[in-house]
Regions:
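Conserved NAD+-utilizing ADP-ribose enzyme module
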Residues: 1-102
């Protein structure tokens, strides 16, 4: 008898938007990052409003929002030093979508 999986596979129905907003500090060329459940990632948002709220929450001056493509966000995350290993879509900060880049 063959058994089939009756629940969805985790992560297969989650997608990242084609365009994202990140927080960038132009003077130092650093980006806003986030740590969730032991995973470090580049913080990204589907709206500029979400990015602004995160900037207010982390209370770092000089941060600017930057609209970039998903592929550009992946490259930025890959270029960040360890421990950054992912993109984190923080539209729901308590349950971020994580896309590993390394």
């Amino acid at each position: 008898m063959t058994q089939t999986l009756s629940i969805p596979l985790i992560g297969l129905d989650e997608t990242f938007p084609d365009e994202l907003f990140v927080l960038h500090h132009p003077a130092t060329d650093r980006y806003g990052c986030f740590h969730h459940d032991g995973v470090h990632g580049l913080a990204c948002f589907s709206s500029e409003t979400g990015a602004f709220r995160f900037a207010e929450w982390i209370d770092l001056s000089g941060m600017a929002t930057k609209q970039i493509s998903f592929d550009e966000a992946r490259e930025i995350a890959k270029a960040r030093p360890l421990p950054v290993v992912s993109l984190m879509l923080l539209d729901d900060i308590h349950n971020p979508q994580i896309h590993f880049v390394r």
